[in-house]
Amino acid sequence: MADSAELKQMVMSLRVSELQVLLGYAGRNKHGRKHELLTKALHLLKAGCSPAVQMKIKELYRRRFPQKIMTPADLSIPNVHSSPMPATLSPSTIPQLTYDGHPASSPLLPVSLLGPKHELELPHLTSALHPVHPDIKLQKLPFYDLLDELIKPTSLASDNSQRFRETCFAFALTPQQVQQISSSMDISGTKCDFTVQVQLRFCLSETSCPQEDHFPPNLCVKVNTKPCSLPGYLPPTKNGVEPKRPSRPINITSLVRLSTTVPNTIVVSWTAEIGRNYSMAVYLVKQLSSTVLLQRLRAKGIRNPDHSRALIKEKLTADPDSEIATTSLRVSLLCPLGKMRLTIPCRALTCSHLQCFDATLYIQMNEKKPTWVCPVCDKKAPYEHLIIDGLFMEILKYCTDCDEIQFKEDGTWAPMRSKKEVQEVSASYNGVDGCLSSTLEHQVASHHQSSNKNKKVEVIDLTIDSSSDEEEEEPSAKRTCPSLSPTSPLNNKGILSLPHQASPVSRTPSLPAVDTSYINTSLIQDYRHPFHMTPMPYDLQGLDFFPFLSGDNQHYNTSLLAAAAAAVSDDQDLLHSSRFFPYTSSQMFLDQLSAGGSTSLPTTNGSSSGSNSSLVSSNSLRESHSHTVTNRSSTDTASIFGIIPDIISLD
């Protein structure tokens, strides 16, 4: 009865998490509020629970109140199958934890850590509760030096046959270990970090090879009743796939009691898998930086360049059975990780390629996220298998201006340059003189080419006949700005004058007269420049007179202007008149045309009597062409070339 009352008091003092563990251990429903869970646990005691459940209650109570000193009577084991058993346990049977000659009793140890004597007394619990220490080795972590082994690799075993399982572990620290952890504290940042850490690792229970970190499914860890943060879940690659955590070592230093008298407890809960067993271990490690790992890699030495040359010859050896043979290999001097020039070329011994990557970038990337995968072939490239290539170190030393090289069949190499550069540099250099001579030749050749291009641009042949289309494509190269004439009135500049009849089409308002008082006449005369042009050919169809004519937004065809100039060749007064071409340059240009002579086209009236006016509007020309014009005087309307169909109407 005393034991029942004591167990009832223990159950009444448990929290929700302990009650859920107890009910789950007993195979009862563990969902509900605290009073519901407490009622279920008390009904379990009243119905008569098994000795294993009673021991679970005491274990949970000891974890709930770890500072309470348990008497040997509290650790008494009830009878199993009505077999006689000792009522109490002597202090000699309580397991001891020894660390460097400092014995200390651990009242927090679960029943699973009792001595072999009690294992024989509990035959039905031996296989489930006894922690197995198989010969399991975990892979060495490059960024951590192993200082001590706090808990050896131990199988995750539970006396619960359900899918969701839980087990408890305990360990204690020695004064030396406490001193190492305390002295490595770094409080420079926002968070307190330790260089010497207590590290928790999980792996599969396999002894074939060193095991990688592998978390059990639905893992949950509590250190000294405080939940431990685990790595976040990875996003699933497929729909419906359960997300998994990346398996990494867990740093539990901040949750560990830095004391030599009070042990630390670790409660692990997980979901059991059929055909898979897991193990855990706790280590005391020292964290390293990427700089230390790089120094250790350099301390290993540089691999002999002859090894790489032998590998090149092996790859480029022709296979007699194959019709395709590799005669050369191209290798980049840029790191595939950072796309920068290599500084410390390295690769793994397990890689079959010649391409190297930069050791500094590779180690720094794995410091942030340890994957240790070769960036060239995507195979495993652990730190222990990295080597520095001596051949690439020589290439980087002598080839400073090239980012790609080519290996030949005999093991030699040559830099690969672009077509614009001089391709005279190889593995054996020609010296300074050769470099200077090639540079001078290149400069002379480039200067000669540039001078030839300038000459071609400066020469323009105006005697060659060209079509009007070609002239319209390049008008800027052949057109010149006409000079101002002091004798021509400025108010008529750029406007065709029709003395008797204005154009019926008015696109823009009339331009106002410009005040010429501020213009110096001497400057205008100096601005005029004489024309030195060769005689124009007889065919005036290809000439463009439009740049010299600007009407009130009227556009005239070049063929019409050419025909008009040919028809009035006998009338010199019209050519020299300022009403038709007010610019001096235009007069000089047309003087040469009239002097050279041109073929005159027949007029509609058979005479030049209609040449009194300069030009007519597009409406009058269209009416003249259609022969619908009524009686008009020749002084009012100028009838010019009604048979020419090249007039474009802008109405």
UniProtKB/Swiss-Prot annotation:
The modification Phosphothreonine is found at T487. It is an enzyme of class 2 (transferase). There is a cross-link at K40, K46, K137, K238, K453, K493 (Glycyl lysine isopeptide (Lys-Gly) (interchain with G-Cter in SUMO2)). Residues 599-621 have a biased composition (Low complexity). A motif (Nuclear localization signal) lies at residues 56-64, 368-380. Residues 124-288 form the PINIT domain. Keywords: Acetylation, Cytoplasm, Cytoskeleton, DNA-binding, Host-virus interaction, Isopeptide bond, Metal-binding, Nucleus, Phosphoprotein, Repeat, Transcription, Transcription regulation, Transferase, Ubl conjugation, Ubl conjugation pathway, Zinc, Zinc-finger. A motif (LXXLL motif) lies at residues 19-23. Its EC number is 2.3.2.-. This is E3 SUMO-protein ligase PIAS1. A zinc finger (SP-RING-type) spans 320-405. Residues 2-200 are annotated as: Required for interaction with MSX1. Sumoylated. It holds the Pfam family PINIT. Sequence repeats lie at residues 520-523, 557-560, 598-601, 612-615. Residues 482-491 have a biased composition (Polar residues). Changing C351 to A/S: Loss of UBE2I-binding; almost complete loss of promotion of TP53 sumoylation; no loss of SUMO1- and TP53-binding.
